[in-house]
Regions:
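A residue-level detector for the "anchor" residue at the start of short, highly conserved motifs
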Residues: 1-76
């Protein structure tokens, strides 16, 4: 059975909330304006690192994952 995640016109705040529940991580977003951005996409049974790499490229941010706390900083 596939574990597909589908997002249709969801705010990044909702996307991060979903990822938090699914992967047991916490998001620390330094620039809160990013949370209002909209995302549409599908992830097919991917791990949190793969998903974050896609989001990083799409939204031009850097992130670090330390002990389940993912800190996100927008690139200047």
């Amino acid at each position: 059975m596939k574990k597909e995640l589908v997002f249709r016109s969801e705010t990044l705040e909702n996307v991060f909330d979903c990822l938090s529940r699914k992967f047991g991580v916490t998001f620390n977003v330094e620039d809160k304006s990013l949370l209002d951005d909209i995302y549409t996409g599908t992830f097919d049974d991917e791990n949190i690192e793969s998903i974050m790499k896609v989001l990083k490229m799409h939204y031009n941010f850097n992130y670090k994952n330390e002990d389940g706390i993912i800190t996100i900083q927008l690139n200047e």
